[in-house]
Design a protein with these regions (language model features):
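Mg2+/Mn2+-dependent nuclease catalytic core
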Residues: 141-246
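Residue-level signal for alpha-helical context at structural boundaries
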Residues: 35-38, 221, 236, 259, ...
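Short helix-capping/linker segments at secondary-structure and domain boundaries
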Residues: 30-39, 208-214, 276-280
Length: 289
C-alpha cells in the first residue's frame, strides 16, 4: 500500500522574519532553544547579570519607555503645558514595570521604586526641546490617530500563509486599514529601513487576509528621533517578505543556514553554540550524514 505523506505547513511569526533579516541562524537557535539547552545558557547569562543594571539593560528600559511614548502620543501632541507633559512622562515611566513585566523578568530585573525614579530622572534630563517640539506638533500620522484612533498590538493570523503577527498600531480609516510600527532605533536619512519595509509588507499581507482590503501604505515611527515616516507597500517588499517566509520555514524544519552578512556575533548569546553547530554540520556533510 502506498503511504500518503501529509505535508504539514510550519507556522511562522512575523518576528521570526525579522530575526532572519538580522541573522538567519538566530531563527535556527531560537527554535531549538527549548529542547537543547540553548535557552538555559541564555537564562544563566542574564541571571548572572541580575544584580546590577548594565548599560545594555538601561537602554532596553529606555526603549520600553520610548515605545510607551509612541502609544501615548495623542496625549502629548498639541499639549503646550510643560508641567502636564512632565506628569505624562511620570505616568508613562511608572506604567513600564507592569506593561513589560515579562521582558523585565527575562532580563532578571525588578524595577523597584528607586530605580524607576532614577530612570525617570535620566530620561527627563536626556530629553531635548527639539525632540519634544516635534512630538507636540501634529503630523499626518497623529492626525489619523486623532480622527480614527488605533488598535494597540492587534494580533493577526493568515491561514493561507500560516503566518501570524501583532502590529504595534492598526488604524482603520474608513475603507483604509493602515499598519504602523514603532521603532526605537535610529531612522535612515530618508524613507524607512529595508527591514522595516519587509516587516510592513508582512503585516500588509496579514491585514489583507483578515480584512479583505488592499494595504497601500504603512507608517514607521522612529520615536527616539520623533521621525514619523510613511512608506508605500511595494511589490518588491511583498516578494522579499514571501521569500524570507519560505527560508524561515526551511530553517524551522531543520535546515542550518549560513550566517547573516552583518550578523551581530559579538553580542549574541548563541555564539558559543553557533561555531559548534557549524563544525558539526561540516563534519556531517563530510561524513555524508
Ligand atoms: S553567533 Fe553570529 S552567526 Fe551565530 S546566531 Fe549569533 S549572530 Fe548569528
Amino acid at each position: 500500500m502506498t503511504k500518503v505523506r501529509v505535508k504539514v505547513k510550519v507556522k511562522v511569526k512575523v518576528s521570526e522574519l525579522m530575526q532572519y533579516v538580522i541573522c538567519p541562524r538566530l531563527v535556527y537557535f531560537r527554535v531549538r532553544a527549548q529542547g537543547r539547552g540553548y535557552e538555559s545558557y541564555a537564562h544563566t547569562h542574564t541571571q548572572a547579570q541580575a544584580h546590577t543594571v548594565t548599560a545594555r539593560e538601561k537602554s532596553m528600559i529606555e526603549s520600553f519607555i520610548l515605545k510607551e511614548f509612541a502609544f501615548n502620543l495623542h496625549k502629548i501632541t498639541g499639549c503646550e503645558d510643560t508641567a502636564a507633559i512632565t506628569a505624562i512622562i511620570g505616568d508613562i515611566v511608572e506604567s513600564v514595570p507592569r506593561i513589560y513585566r515579562e521582558e523585565l523578568e527575562g532580563l532578571g530585573l525588578v524595577l523597584e521604586l528607586d530605580l524607576i525614579e532614577a530612570v525617570k530622572r535620566d530620561f527627563i534630563q536626556g530629553m531635548n526641546d527639539e525632540w519634544l517640539k516635534k512630538l507636540m506638533t501634529e503630523n499626518e500620522l497623529t492626525e489619523l490617530e486623532r480622527v480614527h484612533g488605533y488598535e494597540r498590538e492587534r494580533m493577526m493570523y493568515s491561514e493561507k500563509l500560516n503566518l501570524s503577527g501583532s502590529v504595534d498600531k492598526l488604524i482603520i480609516a474608513d475603507e483604509e486599514v493602515i499598519p504602523c510600527m514603532i521603532k526605537t532605533g535610529k531612522s535612515p536619512g530618508y524613507g524607512v529601513w529595508r527591514s522595516d519595509r519587509v516587516q510592513l509588507a508582512a503585516y500588509a499581507m496579514l491585514i489583507e487576509d483578515e480584512f479583505g482590503s488592499i494595504v497601500k501604505r504603512g507608517f514607521v515611527e522612529y520615536i527616539r528621533e520623533a521621525e514619523f515616516r510613511v512608506t508605500q507597500i511595494r511589490r518588491s517588499d511583498r516578494a522579499e517578505a514571501l521569500q524570507i517566509l519560505k527560508q524561515v520555514r526551511r530553517i524551522k524544519q531543520g535546515a542550518f543556514p549560513d550566517k547573516g552578512r552583518n550578523a551581530p556575533c559579538e553580542n549574541c548569546v548563541y555564539s558559543k553554540y553557533c561555531d559548534t553547530d557549524t563544525r558539526k554540520t561540516l563534519l556531517s556533510k563530510l561524513l555524508g550524514k
